C-alpha cells in the first residue's frame, strides 16, 4: 500500500513556513529533513501548504522526488511555492517523478518567484498531469539553465543545444485538464519555453478546461516565449478564454549552428513547435494572440503543422511582430477552418505580414507545404497587416517557393475577406501550374479581395492592392469577389458548376507573368455577377478582366451579387435611370457569343422600383453614376454595361419597407395618453374619501397595455410601473381640491417588428370636485387635469439574412388629459332603470374625456437611419355609465367597495401621426399610430379600507378595453388626513 501522509502527525508540508536552506520549521512529526524521496507514493494534503524562501540548490535530489509514479492529492486545499531555489543537480527540480507526476483536486497551485538554474526546472517528469484544479498559477519564475549550448573541442566540433529547463518540463507528455477558474502564466523567464519546454517527442494537451487561460509577459532568451518543443501541442474543448499577449523571445544563440536537430532559434513569440503540430481545436471561448514578438520567425505561433479548426469562439491575432517571417503564424502546413469569426489585424513581418507558409519552416527534409482556409460559421478577415521592411506595404499571406495554396473557401453565408493581398512564389526549377480552388468541398460562401479602407497614398502603391496566385484559380461554388480596386493576378481562371465571379468597382482579374513561370491557361467565365453597391458611386471605376496573351470566354448571363435589398434600393442613384460600365474584357480573343444582352432577374422589393438589364452596347441616353457618358468619350471594346430603368418616366417610385415605418414612435403618444389616464384614474380614491381635512396620499401604480395589429398598422404592448403622491383638502360639503405628482417607467414593444421603446414619464395633476344641490336632486361634479412629459428611447433591430442592423433614437412627448364628470341619480328617474337602480343602489354618471399631445422631432443613429418629424394627436370620448357602493360591516377595518361600469365611445379623434424620412435618400412617408376602435368598455373596482379614523388604504383595478385593445391598471396606497 502506498504511503499516505494523512494524520495530524503526518500533515505533509502543511505547516512548513518560512523554510530556509535545510533548516525548515515543520510540524510533520519525527525528524523531517527535506528532500523527500518516495517510491511510488500517494501524498495527501491535510491543510493548505505554503513553502516560502526554500533554498535547495545544494540538494542531491528534488524537494519531493519519486523514482516511479507520484500523485499529490489536494482534497480541495492549496499548494504554494514562493521564492524557492530548485536543486541544480541532474534533472532534479522542486517536484519530480521518473514516471507520472500527478496533481489532482487542489483549490489552487501557485508557483511564484521561484528560481532554477538546473536542468530539471521547477517541475519535471516523464508524464505530468494537472487535473481538477480551480486555479493553476505560475508567475515571475526564473528558469535559466546555463550554458544553453555546448560546443566540443573535437574535430569536427559538435554543438549541442539544451532546451529542457522550464517551469514545466515533461519528457513524454503534459496534460492540463478540468481546470475550473484560471490558468495563469505571467512574467516567467527561461531559455526555451518559459511555461513549458518539452522533448521533441512529447505531447502537450490543454483539454476540457472551463478556466480562463492567460499567458502574458513571458520571455525566453532562445525561442518559444511561452511554450516550446514537443511533437504536438493541443488546446481542445476548452470553454474559457485563451489569451497569449505580450510574450516575446530573443535569439541569444544567434550564430550558433546545432550539429543536428531543428530548433527554430529565436522563433515563436508565444509558441514554438519546431518539428511538431499545434492544434487549436473545438474551443468555445474567445482566443487571442496579441502583441507577441520575436527577432526571427513567427510573432505568435511557429509550428511545422498548424491546425486551427472547429473553434466556436472568436479568434483574434492582432499586433504580433516578427523580424523575419510570419507576423502572426509561420508554418509549413496551415489548415484554418473557423466555426466562429477569425481576424488577423495589424501584424507585421519582413515576409508574410500575418502568415508565412513555406517548406523552409520546420524540418527541411519535409518538402510538402500547403495552405487551406475555410470560413465555416463566421467571417475570416485579414486587415492592416504589413511588411515591416517596407513601410506602407500591406500583406496578408506570403507563400514562398515550394508552398502550395490548396483552397480558399467560405461556407454558406460566411465570408473570407482579404483587405490585404497575398504573395505567392514558385520554385525556380520545374515550376508547375497547379489548381487553386475557391470554395472546395461544397462550400458556397464568398471569398473577397478588396482594397477598401486604404488611404489615397496607399492606393498609389500597386503592392498594396495586388494579390498573386500562381496557379489556375477555379471557383467550384459560391463566389470569388474582386472589388474596390483590388487586383488578383493568376495563371489561369475558370468557373465551375455554380461558381461565380463577382466584380466590383476597380476590381481586376489579370494574368500573372512572373519570370520562369509555367505556361498560363485561358480564362473561362461561366457565371458573372456585379456588385451594384460599389458601382453606384460617383467615383466608381470599371472593373477589368485582362487575360493578356490568353483567351477569354464568357457564357451564361449577368446577375446581381447577393445583397441586402434594403440597402441597395435605398441608394439615391436609383431615383432615375443609370447605366454602369461594369467591366472591360481583354485578351488574345474575347468570345461573348454565349453571353448575349438580356434582362437581370429583379425580385420584388421595397425601396426604389425599376428593372435591371445588361448590354454590350453603350446606352446613349442614360447617364453613368458620375453623371457622364457610360464608358467615357471613347469606351473600350468589349465593355459590358448594366442598366437600371425606373418604373416610371419621371423617377423611380419609392416604397418604404413596413418594418421601417416606425409606428412605435407615433404609438408612444398613445402610451403617453394612457399614462395620463392611468395617473388620473387613481385619484378617484381621494375623491371618494369623505373625511374632511388636509390629506396626503401615496400610491404605487402598475399598468399593462396591448393592441393587436389592425388595418395595416403595427400593434404594441407594454408594461409600466410607478408612483403617485397627492396633497388634497376635503371639505364637509364634499368639495375637494388637490394636486398630485408622480412618475411612470416602462417599455413598449412593437408588434410584429423588433422595436422597443423605453419611457420615463413625469406627471402632474390638478383635480377636484364639488356638489350642486337642487330641490329635487344632488349632482357631484368632478374634474381632473393632468400634464405629462416623457423621455423616450427607441431601439430597433432589423431582420436580415446575414446581419442584424440596429438603430437608436431619443425624443420627448408632451401630453395632456382633462376629464369632467357629473354623477347624478338620473337612473332613478327612468321607469326602465329605476328598479335596477334601487335594487343595486346605482348612481349614473356621464363624462367628457380629452386626451392630446405632441412630440419632438429627432433623427436616429446607427444603421438604416430614419428621421421623424414632430408628431401630434388627440382623442375625445364621452363615457356614460353607472356606479355602486357596498359597505362591509367590519368594526376594526370597515371598507367601502365601489364599482363603476361605463360605455366609452370615442366621438372625435386625430390619430397620432408623423412623417418618417429615410436619411440616406430623404424619401418621406406619412405614418400614423394604431387605429383603436371607437367603442369600448370601462370597468373600475375600487376598495377603501379604514385602518384608523384618519388613515385609509386603497386597492384599485381598472379595465379599459376595446376590440383588439386591452388596458389593465392596478394601484394600491395609503392616505392620511390631518
UniProtKB/Swiss-Prot annotation:
Compartment annotation: Secreted, Cell wall; Cell outer membrane
Record protein name field: Probable outer membrane protein pmp14
GO CC term (a single one): extracellular region
Family named by the database record: Belongs to the PMP outer membrane protein family.
InterPro entries: Autotransporte_beta, Autotransporte_beta_dom_sf, Polymorphic_membr_middle, POMP_repeat
Topology with respect to the bilayer: Peripheral membrane protein
Membrane-spanning intervals of the chain: none
Gene name of the encoded protein: pmp14
Matches recorded under NCBIfam families: POMP_repeat
Main location: secreted
Annotated keywords: Cell outer membrane, Cell wall, Membrane, Secreted, Signal, Transmembrane, Transmembrane beta strand
SUPFAM superfamilies (UniProt xref): Autotransporter
Signal peptide per UniProt: 1-24
Domain Autotransporter: 662-978
